[in-house]
Amino acid sequence: MILFIVPIFIFLGLYFFQEKLIFKPTKLAENYKFQFDEKFEEINILVDKKVILNGVIFRSEAKKGIVLSFHGNKGNLSEIGKRSSLFTENGYDVLYMNYRGYGKSSGTIKSESQLLKDAQIVYDSLKKEYKESQIILFGISIGIGVATYLAAHNNPHSLILTATYSSFKKVLKEKLPFVPGFIWKYELNTNKRLQKVNCPISIFHGKEDLVFSFKHAQTLKENHPRIHLFGFEKYGHTNFLESNIFKKRIIVELNRNSIQK
């Protein structure tokens, strides 16, 4: 009897508290002052009653367009924002947004639909200043599911995915095969949503990735041949983001799909 009851309690715990397993936010005090080498603006976007998402935007002189970046399941903008020069030095503004509960953003993530709805509100706010044809979506790790959703439901200039998965639920099932699939509420089905994406798509993935296997990137490429896939030898989950080879390659992709004003 105990052997039957214990798994039930474990599965119930995973179902109702899986956000704590998936999302690992680092909170920052409301009066925290970001410090970056580049000039930036701190912004706050109201996404729900009393819920504000905090972000930082870096602006370039050329103003070719803007990169809207969605980060992974850990950290906050105090670290992520340090990558801004990769885009600004090549003529693109970049906006880094925190999800609910991350950094100085209020609220908590409670569902996939809520996560994606918030992202759409952020995207819509950018449309007040930029044409959709000037918006580049950039996703890192779990953020690639958010970026892909927006690309599938809007008309951005292009979509750049780093450290990808074909379906987040599939990753969870790979990591915890003993847990029934219906327990997982966060599907984030990248493979399915890419079918509705019309803009250019680029994928960057470390071949030694132990979090999301490189096979996920290969699956996406096989199912969507027009994707430009770049695999990095001897790199893991996201450490290639700091490498010169990645920086050079992404500049090539940005120029290949250069925005026409």
Where would I find each of the regions flagged by the language model?
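Alpha/beta-hydrolase fold nucleophile elbow
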Residues: 130-141
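An N-terminal hydrophobic leader/cap segment in hydrolases
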Residues: 2-46
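Conserved alpha/beta-hydrolase "acid-adjacent" motif
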Residues: 210-216
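Short beta-strand/loop motif that positions the catalytic acidic residue
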Residues: 197, 203-205, 209
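Catalytic active-site module of serine/aspartate enzymes centered on a nucleophile-bearing elbow/loop
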Residues: 244-261
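Membrane-embedded segments
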Residues: 48-125
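Hydrolase active-site cap/lid region
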Residues: 144-199
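Catalytic histidine-centered segment of alpha/beta-hydrolase-like enzymes
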Residues: 235-245
